[in-house]
Regions:
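Alpha/propeptide regions of enzymes that mature by internal proteolysis
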Residues: 1-376
């Protein structure tokens, strides 16, 4: 059997390559986990020749313990997707569970498994109290069907439990991990990416972090410079259409560039309510656009933002935050999302999967050469 990972050396985050989107400073790990109390865990599922998928969990202490709901907002750029829990979240402006990411046809099993895991943690022992009358699991997805057999729906309750148990602060795994194991973007192998920004408010510094599951079409653009997939792969010696795998090309050896989806999760410790969090979430798509997304009609593009400032922000409008401070949070959302997408691509490795399809990693040397040439 061929190894699912064909190259695993020389990968680097955008900043490691000297590529810095925007001007705002980052948190210590430059990750969504820089927001206090936010942790990320992955369960990567690779089996046989056809399964390249997984689960990613974004956890906050209150959400995992069942202690409280957090204010949240949802923005949908294009609704070609299956996000469990989205309508209640949008209506009530609250997040009740960890946010889980997975593959399209596994989303329903993951939602059920999340409920089971939370129930056994908190309400399985009658002496610890009664379970709530209802709970709104939030699970989002992208379609990793090019590299993984989505109809197999291989995700189990144990995988969800593993992702929740693995959730940790500090550096976050990126690229071909968890829900990013089988995803592709902009003609290349992609996956999970994350970044953070710190902004100075009148009340003190606040942190915003972004995590993306990148799986969308378009033409990769790095700091304003186009990096066409066909040219980049040809420069790396990958010119045979067959090497892309059947169904993965649009002709002439160029990888298929249109379609796909992106899920963006933003977390912040800023004390803002759901109405303004929805506005923050909507700015994430500007960051996604900067990386070259084509936002096609068959792309499910969702951005969810939540605040960890429980007790200091409500689900309603928060008039205490001046517009000037909110503008800084908008900027942070744009910059962090842009960098998270780049990290999802730059940290991903060439992968072989379903039906012997191959998706190649971005040749980083070519990216650097392209940017040097564009800058004269």
């Amino acid at each position: 059997m061929n190894s699912p990972v064909l190259t695993d050396d020389g990968r680097a985050r955008a900043r490691d390559l000297g590529l810095v989107p925007g001007r705002l400073p980052t948190g210590p790990a430059n990750a969504i986990s820089d927001v206090p109390g936010v942790r990320v865990g992955h369960a990567t599922v690779i089996a046989g020749a056809d399964i390249r998928t997984g689960v990613t969990a974004i956890v906050h202490d209150d959400l995992l313990s069942g202690a409280a709901a957090l204010p949240a907002g949802l923005s949908v750029f294009n609704g070609f997707g299956k996000m469990v829990g989205s309508t209640q979240l949008a209506q009530l402006g609250t997040l009740e569970t960890p946010v889980l990411l997975t593959a399209t046809l596994s989303v329903f099993r993951v939602a059920d498994a999340l409920l089971s895991c939370l129930h056994e943690r908190h309400w399985g022992n009658p002496q610890e109290g009664h379970e709530p009358g209802t709970l709104n699991p939030v699970v989002a997805e992208t379609n990793d069907g090019y590299l993984s057999d989505i109809w197999a729906r291989p995700i189990t309750t144990e995988h969800v439990r593993m992702a929740l148990d693995a959730a940790a602060d500090g550096p976050v795994g990126e690229g071909c991990v968890g829900a990013g194991t089988g995803t592709s973007a902009l003609g290349f192998k992609a996956g999970i990416g994350t970044a953070s920004r710190i902004v100075g408010w009148a009340t003190g510094p606040v942190t915003l972090g972004a995590l993306v599951q990148a799986n969308f079409g378009g033409e990769l653009t790095v700091l304003g410079t186009p990096v066409p997939a066909a040219e980049a792969l040809a420069a790396a010696g990958i010119t045979d259409e067959a090497e892309q795998g059947s169904g993965g090309s649009s002709g002439g050896g160029a990888p298929r560039l249109s379609g796909g989806s992106c899920v963006i999760v933003l977390a912040t410790d800023a004390a803002v309510g759901s109405g303004r969090l929805e506005r923050v979430a909507s700015r994430a798509f500007a960051g996604m656009a900067r990386t070259g997304s084509d936002f096609s009609g068959r792309s499910g593009d969702y951005a969810l933002a939540f605040s960890t400032a429980a007790g200091r922000a409500t689900a309603g409008p928060d008039e205490r935050v001046p517009d000037s401070d909110l503008d800084l949070l908008f900027k942070a959302a744009i910059e962090a999302t842009e960098e998270a997408v780049l990290n999802s691509l730059f940290m991903a490795t060439t992968t072989r999967g379903f039906r012997d399809h191959i998706r190649h990693a971005v040749p980083l040397d070519y990216v650097r050469a392209r940017l040097r040439a564009s800058r004269g």
